[in-house]
Curated annotation (Swiss-Prot):
<comment type="subunit">
    <text>NDH-1 is composed of 14 different subunits. Subunits NuoA, H, J, K, L, M, N constitute the membrane sector of the complex.</text>
</comment>
<feature type="transmembrane region" description="Helical">
    <location>
        <begin position="124"/>
        <end position="144"/>
    </location>
</feature>
<feature type="transmembrane region" description="Helical">
    <location>
        <begin position="198"/>
        <end position="218"/>
    </location>
</feature>
<dbReference type="GO" id="GO:0003954">
    <property type="term" value="F:NADH dehydrogenase activity"/>
</dbReference>
<dbReference type="GO" id="GO:0016655">
    <property type="term" value="F:oxidoreductase activity, acting on NAD(P)H, quinone or similar compound as acceptor"/>
</dbReference>
<keyword id="KW-0997">Cell inner membrane</keyword>
<feature type="transmembrane region" description="Helical">
    <location>
        <begin position="93"/>
        <end position="113"/>
    </location>
</feature>
<feature type="transmembrane region" description="Helical">
    <location>
        <begin position="240"/>
        <end position="260"/>
    </location>
</feature>
<keyword id="KW-0472">Membrane</keyword>
<dbReference type="GO" id="GO:0005886">
    <property type="term" value="C:plasma membrane"/>
</dbReference>
<dbReference type="GO" id="GO:0048038">
    <property type="term" value="F:quinone binding"/>
</dbReference>
<comment type="function">
    <text>NDH-1 shuttles electrons from NADH, via FMN and iron-sulfur (Fe-S) centers, to quinones in the respiratory chain. The immediate electron acceptor for the enzyme in this species is believed to be ubiquinone. Couples the redox reaction to proton translocation (for every two electrons transferred, four hydrogen ions are translocated across the cytoplasmic membrane), and thus conserves the redox energy in a proton gradient. This subunit may bind ubiquinone.</text>
</comment>
<keyword id="KW-0812">Transmembrane</keyword>
<dbReference type="GO" id="GO:0009060">
    <property type="term" value="P:aerobic respiration"/>
</dbReference>
<feature type="transmembrane region" description="Helical">
    <location>
        <begin position="22"/>
        <end position="42"/>
    </location>
</feature>
<comment type="similarity">
    <text>Belongs to the complex I subunit 1 family.</text>
</comment>
<feature type="transmembrane region" description="Helical">
    <location>
        <begin position="285"/>
        <end position="305"/>
    </location>
</feature>
Length: 347
């Protein structure tokens, strides 16, 4: 008798299955809603922060202090007419933004916001799952560039693919160093391992944290590495032909990946949901509050850099990723491993 027959034959098991499915569905819907709201208001925060840095007011007309601006933008994009170029590959043109958007949400299923707040805890492959999902996102961009039948979109897609692959190496290797230090692949255990990690070891991981952060900037196509969307060269890059909700999906996917990358940096290098320096006096504040504050701090650095730095040339971008960051990360992994063995601090 098959498993399905066993479930149907046993009424209790069927009820349990339905109940568990309902609970998981509610959690997934709640996570998606929270992520969409966070993404929408990250765009608002970006416009406000950059406006203040440039001595402007920023969005201020839609609602008090402009707080309804993201809703106004969403309504505008929903009701805009979706335009598909006559010579575009219609099916691929529509599928591309969906791929990018869905993959940007999948990584959140294993992110622990607190010790007990995680949608799906994968004990062995949480890190591998996030790396795999974020790496697949480039396929949506490549498909968009190809399907648009535009030289600007195609060049933007090629740039994006090369850029993501180049910086994926440095980012993944910086995470490997964390796995060597903690001896864990479970994201929650990685955070818990930072409770007892010596302070000198935390300081030694800071250069890798900086390289990881810069790699995330390149991976999410943010300034100073927004070469795939360089306005002065490619108009808008791979999404130049997109409008309406298709454009919104690319937009939301980019910002969702920013938040995901910041969350992973918080877990790997900043103690996740633990208080700063694991101070006992601060443990009365819930872990998810610390997690949100740390992620917000990393995201502010994204916005600060966008308002401050000019765009790199493409050759400088590739040189930095392959000839500077990659050797540094490899050398640093060797140094950290040797120190762990010498000091008898292997996990």
């Amino acid at each position: 008798m098959t498993i399905c027959t066993d479930i149907i034959a046993n009424g209790y098991d069927l009820k349990t299955l339905i109940y568990n499915s309902g609970v998981v569905s509610i959690k997934v819907i709640a996570l998606i809603i929270c992520l969409l709201l966070a993404t929408a208001y990250l765009t608002f925060a970006e416009r406000k922060v950059i406006a203040y840095m440039q001595l402007r007011v920023g969005p201020s007309l839609a609602g008090p202090f402009g707080l309804l601006q993201p809703i106004a933008d969403a309504v505008k994009l929903v009701f805009k007419e979706p335009i598909i170029p006559a010579k575009a590959d219609r099916k691929l043109f529509i599928i591309a933004p969906i791929i990018t958007f869905v993959l940007s949400l999948l990584g959140w299923s294993v992110i622990p916001i607190d010790h007990d707040i995680v949608l799906s805890r994968i004990h062995i492959g949480g890190i591998l799952f996030i790396l795999a999902v974020t790496s697949l996102g480039v396929y949506g961009i490549i498909i968009a560039g190809w399907a648009s039948n535009s030289k600007y979109a195609f060049l933007g897609a090629v740039r994006s693919a090369a850029q993501m692959i180049s910086y994926e190496l440095a980012m993944a290797l910086s995470i490997v160093a964390v796995l060597i230090v903690t001896g864990e692949m479970d994201l929650i255990q990685i955070v818990e391992a930072q409770k007892t990690r010596p302070i000198w070891l935390t300081i030694m991981m800071l250069p890798l944290a900086v390289i990881y952060f810069i790699s995330i900037l390149a991976k999410t196509n943010r300034l100073p590495f927004d070469l795939p969307e360089a306005e002065s060269e490619l108009v808008a890059g791979y999404n130049v032909e997109y409008s309406s909700m298709a454009f919104a999906m690319f937009f939301l996917g980019e910002y969702a990946n920013m938040i995901l990358g910041s969350s992973l940096m918080t877990i790997m290098f900043l103690g996740g949901y633990l208080p700063p320096f694991n101070l006992e006096i601060l443990t009365f504040i819930p872990g998810y509050i610390w997690f949100i504050l740390k992620v917000s701090m990393v995201l502010f650095c994204f916005l600060w850099i966008r308002a401050t730095l000019p765009r790199y040339r493409y050759d400088q971008l590739m040189y930095l990723g392959l000839k500077v960051f990659l050797p540094i990360v490899l050398a640093w992994i060797i140094v950290v491993s040797a120190i762990l063995v010498y000091s008898n601090n292997l996990p």
